[in-house]
Amino acid sequence: MAIPKRLLGKTGAQVTALGLGGVCWNLLEEDRAAVEVVHRAIDRGITYLDTASSYKESERRLGLALKERDRSQLFIATKCLKRAGDELKQEIEDSFARLDLEVIDLIQVHAIDQERTLSQVLAPDGALRVIEEYRRAGKIRFVGLTGHTHPEMFAKMIQEYDFDTILNPLGPVNRVWNDFAAPTLALARARNMGVIAMKVMAAGKAPPEDRSLYLRFALGPPADVAIVGMDSVEQVEENVRVAENFVPLSQLEEKQLLERALALVPKVKKDLWWLPEQRLAS
């Protein structure tokens, strides 16, 4: 069995439906332990590798791992937080250095959740214009957008620029509390943007008995890729097995899972910073 591969929207890239998130192995104490997680993911067939400049040691450790593997079949995605000008250029240059790459497949303008940040990245010296310079130079292949907290603002941003991909919280917890799917996905699909799901396991708060169901939920339509943070080779193996044997949830399974997710949120919401205080999903 192999992890299914899917077309990542207009990028034309075929990537595995399961991606390796870049936060969790960043938190491990030893570099080698983090590298082993990345290596196991690659060896088990995962091709989409996620990181970000703001994830502390994540980019550097991914760079270490990539030195020991053939990266020609891998898709490397990072994120930038600076909004404009020389600060952003330095952030991007630092990402190249830490990853030790000549070309980055996807760089995502990270955490666009407010009107002010929208204006900043669209400005003449804003993030998108800077990234376009790198694209013209052949250093960055694709540009994406991420957002965590304001679906309506994110939907507006999708219509303001021709992004290649979007990255949103699309797990069960978000579906029942602050749904990104309804306002954003049709817009993204109409523009042939690749759709990437994050917060799949609700920052590790998914009950152990429901973890495989949470992943199956995120692997189903509409996402092309579901990225999951993993900090051990055992977690890699567990998630790969689910992806290799992926079967969409039945209507009953999904209904019952969402009911349990809704009951879970009040117990864990204080640890899930991206969720609003009050429920917004219907």
Task: Give, region by region, the residue ranges found by the protein language model.
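N-terminal binding-site loop/beta-alpha segment at the start of enzyme catalytic domains
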Residues: 1-74
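Generic structural signal for well-ordered alpha-helices
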Residues: 5, 38, 59, 63, ...
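Conserved, mostly hydrophobic/aromatic
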Residues: 8, 20, 49, 62, ...
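Structured C-terminal cap/extension of enzyme domains
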Residues: 40-42, 46-47, 179-282
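Glycine/proline-rich, positively charged
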Residues: 29, 43, 83-172, 176-183, ...
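Short catalytic-loop micro-motif centered on adjacent basic/acidic residues
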Residues: 47-53, 77-78, 141-145, 167-168, ...
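Active-site mouth loops of central-metabolism enzymes
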Residues: 21-32, 77-87, 118-120, 205-209
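Alpha-helix-loop-beta-strand connector modules within alpha/beta enzyme cores
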Residues: 59-78, 127-138, 188-192
